[in-house]
């Protein structure tokens, strides 16, 4: 029987010999490749942390020792070791296990980390609690995939280094976030990793640690505390950490020996390890970006390169910005470490001097864009809905308050699917429409998206275009209607029922409108809202229905209700959107159905509203 079949908890790991542990790493790696090929998920990141994960669970005593993973998509080996191997076939599927750590899922998942750069702060809070409870256990933050590039990580470092808490920060340095890491910190780490001392350590590290005396011997502590034991990590030492490394993150012996020694050191410790994203699977090693987050695939053949006849909204944005840059020399693009996911790869290659990947730094991205705009450039900020909320104060204080012109291209708005609650784009309409000076548009098809991006770029103010993950409905040019600020378009005239649609969800309503002889309106703008058409349709319809892929709390439906109240119109109103709860993972279709946003559910809700 294979070793992996006997691993039900970290305790089983501790019974294994070093050779068995190495074999287990190979089995876990093969299992993850086969498992993700069936479910989809984050592959390259997880292949890079298998040896580290095995070493951590072998040396430390989770959950007494606290392991916080950052970013959380690198936890597949952790899930397998902590008894969830058989559930991996349900990964990111409806009613299955999450692709991220989840406290409700396992006692070994200490902290939910879907967004990056939160682990150091959380680990420090836990370390402080352990100290107050007089515990010798450690809080350990495993920071990888570029999470150290965010300001919050440095806020945590700044605080942690000034304490005497037993916190260990492990930098899993794979030179990647989702896209390539950028910035001065990455350059600094690259210099550390390229040093001759590191090359020598890779060869002799095992010997160094094998000569160390038994656990708790003073000599070992003295040697461990020598500054710059391998390479001087001046930056981290200045923060107040005892810096160790860099070491080879794929050498299990070195990892176990190093962690075993660190285990008994007190105070803030910083271990720098070097890993390769996609390690052990050549297609992922050669193209870690492409294998970062993937769908189902054949492990023998790699990813399917077949093209769909329809464009995704991301591809629509990608094509638009490359074309727009030809005629607008002041156009520049900004993304917080999402150049591939946001569709900026082609732009970056064609216009490298006008492309800015600022790292996982959403707050900085927005205020940086403000500075560019005030200097005569027109920034286009490409950002996921779920990450946009990380820079809310910058949006309000630095941009909207000063009415600084720029365009926000908001990807992954609404139902996202398999990534679940941490990545759902449920809130952007609600948190954007309450801010003065912002125009907010919701395209429902390919042509409308292109129109709105062009309109938003040329507008002398702040515009946001929100669009979902997935393919866009196409529209013939002869059907295209002119885009006018704050004006909706009527797609179909009917009686009794008037459906006001915001975004692609309106396509679910076309057949419903025909079946029920309802009026169907593409609202196009959430802000400014077309108050005239709302007032007009409320006079000759019995029921107004709003539909959106956003939380019903403060969303577009609430905006319509405000218009009715403002104009003192009493009318039956049905608001359909995402419920007031965090949305679970599943396919987009499954999540839409669970939220009542599929055609059958929409029709049923309308029928029920009419009967009341």
Annotated model-derived regions:
Residues 357, 513-537:
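Generic long, charged, amphipathic alpha-helical segments
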Residues 1-81, 235-255, 269-272:
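N-terminal amphipathic, basic-rich helices that act as targeting or association modules
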Residues 230, 257-260, 292-293, 312-327, ...:
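Glycine-/acidic-rich phosphate or pyrophosphate-binding loops and their flanking alpha/beta elements
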Residues 66, 275-388, 394-404, 500-503:
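Non-catalytic terminal/interface segments that mediate subunit docking, oligomerization
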Residues 215-283, 405-410, 429-478, 599-612:
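Structural signature of the thiamine diphosphate
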Residues 42-163, 313, 331, 335-336, ...:
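Cofactor-binding active-site loop characterized by glycine-rich and histidine/acidic residues
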Residues 4, 175-317:
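Long, well-ordered, tryptophan-enriched scaffold segments
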Residues 297-299, 304-307, 417-419, 438-439, ...:
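Peripheral docking tails and interdomain loops at the edges
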């Amino acid at each position: 029987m294979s070793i992996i079949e006997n691993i039900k908890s970290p305790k089983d790991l501790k019974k294994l010999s070093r050779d068995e542990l190495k074999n287990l790493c190979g089995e876990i790696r093969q299992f993850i490749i086969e498992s993700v090929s069936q479910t989809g998920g984050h592959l390259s990141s997880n292949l890079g942390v298998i040896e580290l994960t095995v070493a951590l669970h072998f040396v430390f005593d989770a959950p007494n020792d606290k392991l916080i993973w950052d970013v959380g998509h690198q936890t597949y080996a952790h899930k397998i070791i902590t008894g969830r191997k058989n559930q991996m076939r349900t990964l990111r599927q409806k009613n299955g296990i999450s692709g991220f750590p989840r406290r409700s899922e396992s006692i070994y998942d200490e902290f939910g980390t879907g967004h990056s750069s939160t682990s150091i702060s959380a680990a420090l809070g836990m370390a402080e609690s352990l100290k107050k409870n007089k515990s010798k256990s450690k809080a350990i933050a495993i920071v990888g995939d570029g999470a150290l590039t965010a300001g919050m990580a440095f806020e945590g470092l700044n605080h942690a280094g000034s304490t005497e808490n037993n916190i260990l920060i492990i930098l899993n340095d794979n030179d990647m976030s989702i896209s390539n890491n950028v910035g001065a910190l990455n350059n600094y780490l690259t210099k550390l990793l390229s040093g001759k001392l590191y090359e020598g350590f890779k060869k002799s590290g095992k010997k160094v640690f094998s000569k160390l005396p038994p656990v708790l011997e003073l000599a070992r502590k003295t040697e461990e505390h020598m500054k710059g034991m391998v390479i001087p990590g001046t930056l981290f030492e200045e923060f107040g950490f005892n810096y160790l490394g860099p070491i080879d993150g794929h050498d299990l012996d070195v990892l176990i020996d190093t962690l075993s020694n660190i285990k008994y050191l007190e105070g803030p410790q910083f271990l720098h390890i070097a890993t390769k994203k996609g390690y052990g699977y050549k297609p992922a090693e050669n193209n870690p970006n492409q294998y970062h987050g993937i769908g189902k695939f054949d492990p023998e053949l790699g990813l399917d390169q077949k093209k769909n006849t329809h464009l995704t909204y991301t591809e629509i944005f990608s094509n638009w910005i490359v074309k727009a840059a030809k005629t607008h020399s002041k156009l520049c693009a900004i993304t917080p470490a999402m150049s591939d996911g946001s569709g900026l790869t082609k732009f970056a290659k064609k216009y490298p001097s006008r492309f800015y990947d600022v790292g996982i730094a959403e707050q900085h991205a927005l205020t940086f864009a403000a500075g560019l705009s005030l200097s005569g450039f027109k920034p286009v900020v490409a950002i996921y809905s779920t990450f946009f909320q990380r820079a809310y104060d910058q949006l309000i204080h630095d941009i909207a308050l000063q009415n600084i012109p720029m365009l926000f291209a908001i990807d992954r708005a609404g139902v996202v699917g398999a990534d679940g609650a941490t990545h759902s784009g449920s809130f952007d309409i609600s948190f954007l429409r309450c801010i003065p000076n912002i125009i907010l548009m919701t395209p429902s098809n390919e042509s409308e998206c292109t129109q709105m991006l062009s309109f938003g770029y040329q507008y002398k103010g702040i515009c946001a275009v929100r669009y979902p993950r997935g393919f866009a409905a196409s529209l013939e040019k002869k059907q295209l209607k002119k885009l006018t600020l704050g004006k909706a378009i009527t797609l179909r005239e009917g009686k009794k029922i008037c459906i006001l649609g915001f975004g692609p969800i309106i396509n679910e309503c076309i057949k419903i409108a025909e079946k029920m002889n309802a009026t169907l309106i593409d609202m196009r703008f959430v802000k400014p809202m077309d108050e005239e058409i709302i007032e007009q349709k409320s006079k000759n319809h019995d029921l107004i229905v709003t539909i959106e892929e956003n939380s019903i709390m403060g969303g577009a439906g609430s905006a319509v209700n405000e218009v009715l109240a403002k104009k003192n119109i009493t009318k039956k109103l049905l608001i359909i959107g995402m419920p007031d709860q965090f949305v679970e993972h599943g396919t987009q279709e499954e999540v839409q159905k669970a939220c009542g946003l599929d055609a059958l559910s929409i029709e049923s809700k309308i029928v029920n509203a009419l009967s009341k």
